[in-house]
Design a protein with these regions (language model features):
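Conserved catalytic-core segment of nucleotide-activated headgroup transferases in glycan assembly
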Residues: 21, 131-166
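A charged, aromatic-enriched C-terminal amphipathic alpha-helix characteristic of glycosyltransferases
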Residues: 218-254
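Catalytic core of nucleotide-activated saccharide and alditol-phosphate transferases
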Residues: 64, 79-135
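Acidic donor-binding loop of glycosyltransferase active sites
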Residues: 171-186, 197-200
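Short hydrophobic faces within alpha-helices
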Residues: 193-194
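N-terminal pre-catalytic "stem/leader" segment of glycosyltransferase-like enzymes
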Residues: 1-67
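Conserved acidic donor-binding loop of glycosyltransferase catalytic domains
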Residues: 182, 202-205, 212
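Short His-centered aromatic/hydrophobic patch
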Residues: 73-77
Length: 254
């Protein structure tokens, strides 16, 4: 039985303004997720996802296609109207504006996403993909320690995730996963939540997912978790997006 793809729509004002987000979206596994991005500004596309232009101030802000998940980026009124009026099981608004009013038609509102979803330009250009989450002290990378230390000198501790049989939401972070923790970081709860993105969206159960290599943090010698089996596509979609939200900003979404 062939499993249906997750259908994801992203609404933006323009592709240049949300480059970091789109770089992540562009790396989603196209075998699992079908991505449509709608922009209010004209563009020259270099991305592999479907990219569409939509004009402002249409009489009806309506996309005649249904999605599992709809995401609106920013506070642009036309972007928000398009997202609200598109049929979807889950609607999410990502906003960096603290004064934004509440939108009851969105299932979740995530704030200050630009500080928490990041692709390092320097490493990206050298084909060394890195994702930095939660604060400047935590880095997730598929690079080996020696290569990353060439770019970031003050990393002290290495946390290794075992290789998975399946790909996680960010499919470009493949094979061996590493988390590098700079000295002085005490927010271990948030750090551990980074692991859960890759550990909880799978349909099969896993145990002993995380092995931790460190001397100072010997209290965290082992961290075990099992992914819950997902019985239907709808709950599978929500599980993916919930973990996506946790990775971006666990504290600030509503």
């Amino acid at each position: 039985m062939v499993k249906s793809k997750l259908k994801l729509a992203v609404f933006i004002e323009g592709i240049d303004k949300y480059k970091n987000i789109l770089e992540l979206v562009n790396r989603l596994d196209k075998n699992l997720i079908e991505v449509d991005v709608y922009s209010l500004k004209l563009f020259n596309s270099k991305y592999s996802f479907n990219l569409y232009f939509r004009r402002r101030k249409f009489l009806f802000h309506k996309i005649y296609k249904s999605y599992d998940v709809v995401i609106a980026l920013g506070v642009d009124k036309d972007v928000i109207k398009y997202a609200i009026n598109t049929n979807a099981n889950l609607k999410i608004l990502f906003s960096y504006d603290e004064k934004i009013k509440k939108y009851p038609k969105f299932n979740k509102i995530v704030r200050e996403y630009e500080d928490y979803t990041y692709v390092d330009e320097k490493l990206f250009k050298k084909n060394l993909p890195t994702v930095k989450v939660f604060n400047d002290n935590i880095i997730i990378s598929c690079m080996n320690k020696e290569k990353l230390l060439d770019y970031t000198k003050d990393i002290n501790y290495v946390f290794e995730l075992k290789q998975f049989e399946n790909k996680d939401l960010f499919s470009y972070l493949e094979t061996n996963y590493y988390i590098y923790l700079k000295e002085g970081v005490e927010d271990l709860d948030n750090m551990l939540k980074c692991y859960l993105l890759g550990a909880t969206i799978f349909e099969e159960e896993y145990s002993d997912i995380i092995g931790i290599k460190t001397k100072k943090l010997n209290a965290l010698k082992s961290f075990k978790t099992k992914a819950k089996k997902v019985n239907n596509l709808s709950s599978y979609n929500k599980k993916i997006m919930n973990n996506f939200l946790d990775l971006i900003n666990y504290k600030n979404y509503h």
